[in-house]
Swiss-Prot record:
The keyword Transmembrane does not apply. GTP hydrolase that promotes the GTP-dependent binding of aminoacyl-tRNA to the A-site of ribosomes during protein biosynthesis. Its EC number is 3.6.5.3. It is found in: Cytoplasm. SUPFAM superfamilies: P-loop containing nucleoside triphosphate hydrolases (SSF52540), Translation proteins (SSF50447). It is an enzyme of class 3 (hydrolase). The keyword Hydrolase applies. Its main location: cytoplasm. This is Elongation factor Tu. Residues 1-125 form the tr-type G domain. The gene is tufA. It comes from Prochlorothrix hollandica. It catalyses: GTP + H2O = GDP + phosphate + H(+).
């Protein structure tokens, strides 16, 4: 459930597969879910390379991953695959306190992975010229400040001012008193940003996942609609 919630907002993903063990049952499940919720691009990291002495085994695991990606509708032949060891890279950075390139082969592999992410996963165009809309992912309270709804802005912009809470219960008006991202106060949040929206006069129990925040009177909730449902079996 948590994987679906997060994946539904992704512009791309890094699929981590153990080079020592190869694709596991959950690997197949994660690829399927990524495809179903519309993750457009994937880059693969073959972790634990330090535990694999046989280059042919590493090539076999890479081939398995490519075939699996192709099976579920991704372009398995062109997806970048980088092998490395996250643990070795972290140990090297802790020991030397550096993340510079060309100083450690394992750290270099992480740099290579992120370079592939930058090259292969484009930044999509954000819809900022339409009315604000954000699905609520989580809700929490800040003592002395009020209730915060978090989520990824689907479209438009949000800043201090009037807002409407839509879904599940009757529509309700509120006032945005602050917008934060990574504990920094913003003048405004825009499409694509993961933000926390501080709401005036709203209790934590008034909000839940499935509701949306929107520009006042810009959307209408419906109780009848057509949808496509994917059911996963164990």
């Amino acid at each position: 459930k948590n994987m679906i919630t997060g994946a539904a907002q992704m512009d791309g993903a890094i699929l981590v597969v153990s080079a020592a063990d190869g694709p596991m049952p959950q690997t197949r499940e994660h690829i399927l879910l990524a495809k179903r919720v519309g993750v457009p691009n994937i880059v693969v990291f073959l972790n634990k390379q330090d535990m694999v002495d046989d280059d042919e085994l590493l090539e076999l695991v890479e081939l398995e991953v490519r075939e699996l990606l192709t099976e579920y509708g991704f372009d398995g032949d062109s997806i970048p695959i980088v092998a490395g060891s996250a643990l070795q890279a972290v140990d090297a950075m802790i020991a030397k306190g550096t993340t510079k390139q060309s100083e450690n082969e394992w750290v270099d592999k992480i740099h290579k992975l992120m370079a592939e992410v930058d090259a292969f996963i484009p930044t999509p165009e954000r819809i900022i010229d339409k009315p604000f809309l954000m699905a609520i992912e989580d809700v929490f309270s800040i003592t002395g400040r009020g209730t915060v709804a978090t989520g990824r802005i689907e479209r438009g912009k949000v800043k201090v001012g009037e807002i409407e809470i839509v879904g599940i219960r009757d529509n309700r008006q509120s006032i945005v008193t602050g917008v934060e991202m990574f504990r920094k106060l913003l003048d405004e949040g825009m499409a694509g940003d993961n933000v926390g929206v501080l709401l005036r006069g709203i209790q934590r129990e008034d909000l839940e996942r499935g509701m949306v925040l929107a520009k006042s009177r810009s959307i209408t909730p419906h109780t009848k609609f057509e949808s496509e449902v994917y059911v996963l079996k164990k």
